[in-house]
Design a protein with these regions (language model features):
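ATP-dependent helicase/translocase motor core
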Residues: 1-188
């Protein structure tokens, strides 16, 4: 590919990925799962976790996935996102974080997503942008897969609190960590 595209290879790949994710039947998930084909060359954009460790080559490829985290990402001149997580350079998750001690909650983050985030911004475009957007504070987490202004629907992404018939919404309180610590301990 370098021989064909020379110094424009990186820009060509990025443009091709963008075109594939934004076309009518395209999506970021499809591009991640199936890769892209450029000039009859297949380019894998992510490696899934192999079911077993029998094939060391697949295990090695999986370990080469690069997850990165960026704080304060500007999606446009007017939209700054608290945290964005990338997989091999492609934005897959966004987070609006609020602090209960400062008088804010996940509800403020939901309001921000509904009113301050343009669903047509490339980062938030349905199917082509982030796969999931999280609104969270130190006690609760909510998520949506599609930003749609005031019509954006958020689902709780909490562990639940209590056991059996006495279980309730939210997350358990812990003495030594935040109620939402499962997000970085178990999910991410």
């Amino acid at each position: 590919l370098r021989k064909i595209y020379k110094d424009d290879l990186e820009e060509t790949i990025v443009s091709f990925i963008n075109a594939e994710t934004t076309k009518t039947r395209g999506s970021l998930i499809e591009v991640l799962k199936h890769g892209i084909e450029l000039s009859n060359q297949k380019i894998e954009l992510m490696y899934t976790k192999p079911a077993t460790t029998f094939n060391p080559e697949l295990t090695k490829k999986y370990s080469q996935n690069i997850f990165s985290v960026m704080e304060e990402v500007w999606a446009s001149d007017k939209e700054r996102i608290d945290v964005v997580i990338f997989l091999n350079g492609l934005a897959i998750m966004s987070f609006e974080l609020k602090c209960n001690a400062a008088g804010q909650s996940y509800q403020d983050a939901i309001y921000q997503f509904r009113t301050d985030r343009n669903p047509k911004t490339r980062l938030f475009r349905f199917k082509a942008g982030t796969l999931v957007n999280f609104a969270m504070d130190l006690e609760e987490v909510y998520m949506t897969t599609k930003l749609d202004g005031q019509a954006t629907f958020f689902l709780p992404f909490n562990m639940g609190n209590g056991h059996g018939v006495t279980a309730g919404a939210g997350n358990p309180a812990f003495k030594d960590k935040y109620s939402v610590s499962y997000m970085w301990e178990d999910i991410l």
